[in-house]
């Protein structure tokens, strides 16, 4: 429901007979910005927004970081937040969000806002004091300290269900077993004591660690349903052991460690693996062979994933696995997402995954920025134009494959080669096709930022695919 719809309803007198308690429930479903706007609709609505149960203060909506008087704007923003909560009429709140970058000069205001949330028995608390300009841990780690520490009153709050703290210090030992929220997200801080947090967290169902540094963690265990580890820096190379028998969503993005898996849910719903932080390489070496074995073994422990998303680095390295014990085994994956440059150095990795996904129904190519590597040269005997014809037949494809999706489609020959093969094999251009895959459609999503000349190339490629598609639908989405 949007602000315009509510305004239209009021004009037609559709809401005038509803009691205030229901109107408050309705406006609590709006974004905080739209909720505030309802105060100008009519006299009756003037103060209803003061009882919304979802409050969100975002500095970026109030302060233009490019203006000369940024300091005075931040002072005004802090005063606005304190004034707003001082006039709040409700007894309880569901959510309080504070997005205020490095508020070192406003600590008293921030603490009073948090105390307000605790007094209203908040369920979901977001404290994000990171700088929007930070793009990596190296940007944030230059600060020797975090200016805001989580107040003592938060640790004992029994109503808290979800806590997000970015660039905000906290003491894991102060959370008792019964007081830790079910969902915890930590980011943009030096984090050295994760294991003590996990040892005392039987109620924790979702843990997200993002852009932290100095991490020392060797065992990740618990009854969690969701685990996210994104773009963190470790204090040293280490063995990282996972014991997550009930996890349903698993996302790991960052450095390659010596991964060990004790237990993993064999019916896991969603797995995302991203090792692009390792960079790119053109020549194989002893390190890449070792990492190929590590990642192949890691995939085997995650082979129950219904949806699996992988990165170019994984596609390139898993083909280098030489240890028979770690060679890729058949997986249960039904939706495979390949984040790829469609470079020849990734082709064998793509084939390995296709060969080991016998239940695959949807194949997605998520194509992102091209590298400086040449797309016309071969890579250890793999040719960019001939590989798909020489190394794949209809027998290589999962018999269950129904949908192929291409995101950021550009119509370049690398994309067209693999799509031509998939379409031709799916529509019956191969001998013995009656036992082959049953491809139903190909979905092409163009990038809205493409130049006109690039768009023309993509249009030509899409038309060519449509001309050979037969019974296979080729759908083009041009934003």
From Swiss-Prot:
InterPro entries reported for this sequence: F-box-like_dom_sf (IPR036047), F-box_dom (IPR001810), FBL13/AtMIF1-like (IPR050232), LRR_At1g61320_AtMIF1 (IPR055357), LRR_dom_sf (IPR032675)
Extent of the LRR repeats: 99-129, 139-167, 186-211, 228-254, 287-312, 342-367, 419-446
UniProt KW Repeat keyword: yes
Domain F-box per the UniProt entry, residue ranges: 12-60
Pfam family, one: LRR_At1g61320_AtMIF1
Keywords: Leucine-rich repeat, Repeat
Name of the protein in question: Putative F-box/LRR-repeat protein At1g56400
Species, as recorded: Arabidopsis thaliana (Mouse-ear cress)
């Amino acid at each position: 429901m949007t602000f315009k719809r509510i305004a239209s309803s009021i004009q037609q007198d559709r809401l005038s007979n509803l009691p205030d308690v229901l109107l408050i429930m309705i406006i609590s479903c709006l974004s905080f910005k739209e909720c505030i706007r309802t105060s100008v609709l009519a006299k009756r609505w003037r103060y209803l927004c003061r009882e919304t149960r979802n409050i969100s203060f975002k500095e970026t909506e109030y302060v233009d970081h490019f203006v000369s008087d940024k300091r005075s704007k931040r002072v005004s923003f802090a005063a606005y937040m304190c004034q707003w909560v001082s006039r709040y009429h409700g007894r309880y709140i569901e959510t309080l969000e504070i997005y205020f970058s490095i508020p070192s000069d406003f600590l008293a205001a921030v603490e009073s806002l948090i105390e307000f949330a605790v007094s209203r028995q908040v369920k979901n608390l977001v404290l994000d004091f990171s700088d929007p300009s930070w793009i990596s841990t190296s940007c944030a780690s230059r600060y020797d300290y975090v200016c805001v520490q989580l107040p003592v009153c938060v640790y004992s709050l029994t109503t808290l269900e979800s806590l997000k703290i970015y660039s905000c210090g906290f003491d894991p030992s102060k959370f008792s077993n019964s007081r830790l929220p079910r969902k915890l997200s930590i980011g943009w801080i030096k984090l050295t004591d994760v294991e003590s947090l996990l040892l005392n967290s039987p109620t924790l169902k979702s843990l997200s660690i993002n852009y932290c540094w100095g991490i020392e963690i060797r065992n990740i265990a618990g009854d969690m349903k969701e685990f996210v580890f994104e773009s963190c820096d470790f204090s040293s190379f280490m063995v990282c052991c996972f014991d997550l028998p009930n996890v349903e969503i698993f996302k790991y993005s960052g450095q390659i460690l010596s991964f060990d898996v004790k237990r993993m849910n064999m019916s896991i719903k969603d797995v995302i693996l991203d090792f692009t932080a390792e960079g790119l390489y053109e020549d194989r070496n002893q390190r890449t062979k070792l990492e190929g074995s590590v990642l192949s073994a890691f995939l085997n422990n995650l082979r129950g994933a219904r949806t699996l998303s992988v990165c170019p680095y994984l596609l390139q390295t898993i083909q280098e696995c030489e240890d028979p014990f770690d060679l890729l085994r058949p997986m249960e994956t039904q939706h495979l997402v390949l984040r790829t440059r469609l470079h020849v150095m990734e082709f064998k990795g793509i084939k390995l995954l296709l060969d080991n996904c016998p239940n695959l129904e949807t194949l997605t190519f998520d194509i992102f920025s091209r590298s400086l590597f040449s797309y016309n040269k071969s890579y250890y005997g793999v040719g960019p134009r001939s590989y798909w014809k020489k190394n794949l037949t209809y027998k290589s494809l999962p018999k269950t494959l129904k949908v192929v999706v291409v995101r950021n489609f550009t119509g370049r020959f690398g994309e067209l080669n693999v799509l031509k093969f998939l379409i031709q094999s799916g529509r019956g251009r191969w001998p013995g096709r009656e036992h082959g895959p049953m491809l139903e459609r190909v979905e092409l999503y163009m990038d809205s930022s493409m130049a006109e000349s690039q768009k023309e190339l993509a249009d030509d490629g899409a038309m060519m695919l449509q001309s050979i598609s037969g019974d296979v639908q080729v759908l083009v989405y041009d934003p």
